[in-house]
């Protein structure tokens, strides 16, 4: 499966500013509901990922929901109320959560923090060739967005995992 998951506020740097929180949310979700990350890149305001789920399991929505919820909860738990998450660090504070960010009435009723776009885009990968195209898309996306000149310069990408020499255990 290929995914694009986006923050509600285009131009935010929250995902890269808070990469440790995001990585923790992904790791915890993987422990509870296993999946394999074929490729993943975290940009300041969105994520591209290619995942393989266990045979017979297609519940990727629950996994993304858990990742989003854990990330958001981590921000809320450490917040200094009244500060926007993207501005708190510039002001010398720990990350904050601003409950006054513009949220639709339905998001307010559901307690949605207004950090994430409500849904995500997914695409079922049809074959190995398409899988490789989508993996390459993940890895080259920071270049496409002008964040780096070479994909290996972007620190928040599985390209580093995929270019390391493989180590095998010899029994």
What is each stretch, according to the model?
Residues 1-171:
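Short catalytic/metal-binding and nucleic-acid-binding patches
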